[in-house]
């Protein structure tokens, strides 16, 4: 006996005659069911669950898929019966609506044959589980064979789990009787045919799109099992039928008509695949503006034409077909906003292009002037240095900046070599410095005769200070630090100088001067220029920390400060801002630490020509450039600003400001004022005993 619950999307169907069926596997042993017996097919309306007879299937299981009620057809113990029957329980007639049986289909009937003893001994097994809905449920049972009517063949389909993705199609059919098909997106199809020796064919579980292919695979599989198909007799050709082909194609056509497909393989509408250029062209055609022909050089933009990109696609793109159309007023408003955005973008791009064009023109002009200057320096000035270096033409070229390719050579010639240092002397000083480093690292106490006046502690302190200062020299370049390409060269020059001038030793700030020389000269030539540069009166006064001479330089600076910038000078005096607060760092490093490197090199160019006077003239030029800002600051902010100048200080503006500074006071030049102050300082020291200490 086979019991079960089954419901469709429209009617509940009571049926029987299903054997052991599992999705994906052939169902066997259909011969245990007597399909010749009369059967009754009834379909009640939607309603509550029908109470049937007490002989219920105790083996039916609930589905494991989210509590979906299932049709459980398992493999219980054999139940002997002579036929398979469907009958309504008499005791529950009042509980079942009468209209539930008014739509029952009366199938063609005939006199049922008497069941044989063999048929009574045969057993019926329950089939596997099929999903179904929770709308209706019908109990299937078979009490006796007398309550059944005759029906040669039956085709029953139940399906449609409306709340889930899976549904079931159970088919028991032949060619001339009822054939019902109810499906959803996925279905499990069981096809059953009865004949003298009925059998199940196959069970498949697939989606609606795969049903057609699976039916064909089933037919191929059945063709291989020829012996089983021969048993089915004239009904075997029914297996080639595709019950879902019509619905399948209809649904696919319906999906393809839609423009938006979220979950599927249907292609989007053609409008969604337009690119921005095509949309822009269509917009220009609608607006009546002729589109420009494509340029042969598409990568080169001529006349700074603006090409809208993502903005065009966002604003001018039509709405999807499933959304309401954009009102005309809103569309016009968006079009106006789009045109305004394009105009603003054109203005910004035009302004940026003009700025870039100006920068490019300036760069080309500078490069061209540098190229011409290199030819002039190499062909005219350097071969005739002694006669041309003080000429008006050379001085003008000097003010504009020395080309980097000849800068080192010009610096060497301008600084000179009054100390007569040779490359051999540099090698001797370097070897002595390396020996001293080794002796200090091994803890040796050997002191040479010429260094007897300097303790080992002073030498060790100088070496440690060199090591510390090198790590802080142009840290942004990362070429003088440990492991950098110029670290050893800088270390060698500073170490050799401490051996060459032990009376001076190493002073903070020397590393920046030596680093700038290394960037433009070879190691030996850089050492020669470094030693002669530090031997100048101003540098020697500062590096030897000659306090009296330093004050004299500061006093001379204030004379020209008051002459050129009286308003700012009075403001500095009012706030007690003395020159030593900002001048010491500028003079010690020759502006290489305070200004950008390329700007500092230009200052070095003129410094090599004009000497120490240009260092103080440059200081006055910086003060004049920022005069308006400094006059609004107090003492603290002025000191902070001058000790840390802006990094983007423009070179041309600075040199224009320096050019306005007149290094003449009361018809006296820098050297005359400095000499007079030095003379006065000596006289004051002689006349005032307090100044001697």
UniProtKB/Swiss-Prot annotation:
Mention one GO biological process in which this protein takes part, according to its record.
Answer: negative regulation of autophagy
User: Does the record bear Phosphoprotein in its keywords?
Assistant: yes
Q: Where is the Rab-GAP TBC domain?
A: 401-611
Modified residue annotations for Phosphoserine: 91, 295
Name of the protein in question: TBC1 domain family member 14
What is the role of this chain? Plays a role in the regulation of starvation-induced autophagosome formation. Together with the TRAPPIII complex, regulates a constitutive trafficking step from peripheral recycling endosomes to the early Golgi, maintaining the cycling pool of ATG9 required for initiation of autophagy.
Lineage: superkingdom: Eukaryota
